[in-house]
């Protein structure tokens, strides 16, 4: 009697074994199963999410970057690029094998038609803009440059829901997996598939209606007709529209509004590495332009300590009690943040073929000093005409007589605001940032303060002039 076959050790052994014994039916079934998990974009997100929810409960710091993604420990952890490469390699092998066997991957034809509704806005002219930033860099303010334009569908931080619903470990493959989930959700949103958010909204929408979309009121497109449905008594939205009362958000109507607009723009502070956006840049259904917004890391930290006081208790304690040393974990986290930003910017400024003409680096300080000029540059880069409506908003909201006390306000006396941190930051705090983020500050043209006097001396500039160097 013939011995039972041992289970093959890798995919190649399986293919070889199946070919030898002619068991094509079993192989095709395997291919179909794998395609369901890898190729089907909408389903993979929910499946990955469910899997990751089983990881021990950990709320990720929105401002932290896992150093393991930059330098893996003992080469035992997968970096994002390695994990992404593994997925792409398996996808390619399955595609080639299925063609050899005469099987056409069904998902390709389905995805090819996914963006057809957007062609109503004008074939070949639709732009997709991603404002890539970190918290407290002025991204809400700069995002308004796109939100105020009537023909742009703008979303404010939709990835917030993913971070609050799916819990990731700080290190290793789980952190890389989070980036893949963010990317897949981001792609579907840029394609106006807003249903992709529903599994991550808590509590879940009913009949595509929700009262809990994060910062709905920060998107004009979600607060205008026909998306703004009649107000329902005793039904109150957590993040309501600012200037009018609307009923719960109808996700179907929101998606339709997105497809009617000429362009799509989205602000995200949870995108860690520029390289992971390559599949989106190369997707033929998207014409993606990435604007990376950066700010002096000293100003960022000063702002975060105020805005996220609970997360920065260790810093506040260190400052108030006069301790000599800050926790090394805190310093490492700060260094990881800066390194992540620097590596993304260096990649963008190198202009690899896939990113050429699709990346722009902008300093918040330049926007604050010359908001209208920088808005024109960003719109020119995106290939979208700037309207008088946006220009008027910029004029009115960058010359406020006094800054709002709201840390999330988008109304600023911007020419004064960008240096305000210098006069409230203790010099020893500036020293920690300068030591941890020196290479990043050098790349972006932020000068080091030599002492407490130079930090608070307004006549001493801590900013190098960089001109059009920032547009690539």
From Swiss-Prot:
N-glycosylated. Its EC number is 2.8.2.17, 2.8.2.21. Signal peptide: none annotated. One of its GO terms (biological process) is T cell homeostasis. One of its GO terms (molecular function) is chondroitin 6-sulfotransferase activity. Widely expressed. Highly expressed in spleen, lung, eye and stomach. Constitutively expressed at low level during the mid- to late-gestation period. Expressed in the brain in a temporally controlled manner: peaks at 2 weeks after birth in the cerebellum, but at 3 weeks in the cerebrum. Localizes to stromal cells in the bone marrow, and stromal cells in the marginal zone and red pulp of the spleen, but the sense probe did not. Disruption phenotype: Mice are viable through adulthood. In their spleen the level of chondroitin 6'-sulfate is almost undetectable. In the spleen of 5-6 week-old mice, the number of CD62L(+)CD44(low) T-lymphocytes corresponding to naive T-lymphocytes is significantly decreased, whereas those in other secondary lymphoid organs are unchanged. Glycans are attached at residues 63, 74, 96, 250, 413, 457. Residues 39-472 are lumenal. It is an enzyme of class 2 (transferase). It catalyses: chondroitin beta-D-glucuronate + n 3'-phosphoadenylyl sulfate = chondroitin 6'-sulfate + n adenosine 3',5'-bisphosphate + n H(+); 3'-phosphoadenylyl sulfate + keratan = adenosine 3',5'-bisphosphate + keratan 6'-sulfate. It comes from the Eukaryota. It is found in: Golgi apparatus membrane. The keyword Transferase applies. The chain crosses the membrane at residues 20-38. InterPro entries: Carbohydrate_sulfotransferase, Gal/GlcNAc/GalNAc_ST, P-loop_NTPase, Sulfotransferase_dom. Keywords: Carbohydrate metabolism, Glycoprotein, Golgi apparatus, Membrane, Signal-anchor, Transferase, Transmembrane, Transmembrane helix. One of its GO terms (cellular component) is Golgi membrane. It is a single-pass type II membrane protein. Gene3D superfamilies: P-loop containing nucleotide triphosphate hydrolases (3.40.50.300). Residues 1-19 are cytoplasmic. 3'-phosphoadenylyl sulfate binds at residues 135-141, 295-303. Pfam families: Sulfotransfer_1. Sulfotransferase that utilizes 3'-phospho-5'-adenylyl sulfate (PAPS) as sulfonate donor to catalyze the transfer of sulfate to position 6 of the N-acetylgalactosamine (GalNAc) residue of chondroitin. Chondroitin sulfate constitutes the predominant proteoglycan present in cartilage and is distributed on the surfaces of many cells and extracellular matrices. Catalyzes with a lower efficiency the sulfation of Gal residues of keratan sulfate, another glycosaminoglycan. Can also catalyze the sulfation of the Gal residues in sialyl N-acetyllactosamine (sialyl LacNAc) oligosaccharides. Belongs to the sulfotransferase 1 family. Gal/GlcNAc/GalNAc subfamily. This is Carbohydrate sulfotransferase 3.
């Amino acid at each position: 009697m013939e011995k039972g076959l041992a289970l093959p050790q890798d995919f190649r052994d399986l293919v070889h074994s199946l070919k030898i014994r002619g068991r094509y039916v079993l192989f095709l079934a395997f291919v179909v199963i794998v395609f369901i998990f890898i190729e089907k974009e909408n389903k993979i997100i929910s499946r990955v999410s469910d899997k990751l929810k089983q990881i021990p409960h950990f709320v990720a710091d929105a401002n932290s970057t896992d150093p393991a993604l930059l330098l893996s420990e003992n080469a035992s952890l997968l970096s994002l690029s390695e994990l992404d490469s593994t997925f792409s390699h398996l996808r390619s092998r399955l595609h080639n094998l299925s063609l050899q066997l005469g099987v056409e991957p069904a998902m390709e034809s389905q995805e090819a038609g996914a963006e057809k509704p957007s062609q109503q806005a004008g074939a070949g002219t639709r732009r997709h803009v991603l404002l890539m930033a970190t918290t407290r860099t002025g991204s809400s303010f700069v995002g308004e440059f796109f939100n105020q334009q009537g023909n742009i569908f703008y979303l404010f931080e939709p990835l917030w829901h993913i971070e609050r619903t799916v819990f990731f470990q700080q290190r290793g493959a789980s952190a890389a997996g989070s980036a893949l989930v963010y990317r897949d959700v981001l792609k579907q949103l840029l394609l106006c598939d807003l249903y992709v958010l529903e599994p991550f909204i808590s509590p879940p929408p009913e009949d595509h209606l929700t009262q809990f979309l994060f910062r709905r009121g920060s998107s004009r497109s979600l607060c205008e007709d026909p998306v703004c449905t009649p107000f329902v008594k005793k039904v109150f939205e957590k993040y309501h529209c600012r200037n009018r009362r609307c009923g719960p958000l109808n996700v179907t109507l929101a998606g339709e509004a997105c497809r009617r607009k000429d362009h799509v723009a989205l602000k995200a502070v949870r995108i860690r590495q520029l390289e992971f956006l390559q599949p989106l840049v190369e997707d033929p259904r998207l014409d993606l332009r990435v604007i990376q917004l950066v700010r002096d890391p000293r100003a960022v930290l000063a702002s975060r300590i105020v805005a996220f006081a609970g997360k920065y208790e260790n810093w506040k304690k260190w400052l108030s009690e006069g301790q000599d040393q800050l926790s090394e974990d805190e310093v490492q986290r700060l260094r990881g943040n800066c390194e992540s930003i620097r590596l993304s910017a260096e990649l963008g400024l190198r202009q690899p073929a896939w990113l050429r003409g699709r990346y722009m680096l902008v300093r918040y300080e330049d926007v604050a000093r010359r908001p209208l000029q920088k808005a024109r540059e960003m719109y020119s880069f995106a290939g979208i005409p700037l309207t008088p409506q946006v220009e008027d908003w910029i004029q009115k909201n960058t010359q406020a007589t006094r800054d709002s006390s709201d840390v999330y306000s988008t109304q600023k006396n911007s020419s004064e605001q960008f240096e305000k941190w210098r006069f409230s930051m203790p010099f020893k705090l500036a020293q920690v940032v300068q030591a941890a983020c020196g290479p990043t500050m050098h790349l972006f043209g932020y000068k080091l303060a030599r002492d407490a006097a130079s930090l608070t001396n307004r006549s001493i500039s801590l900013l190098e002039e960089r001109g059009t160097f920032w547009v690539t």
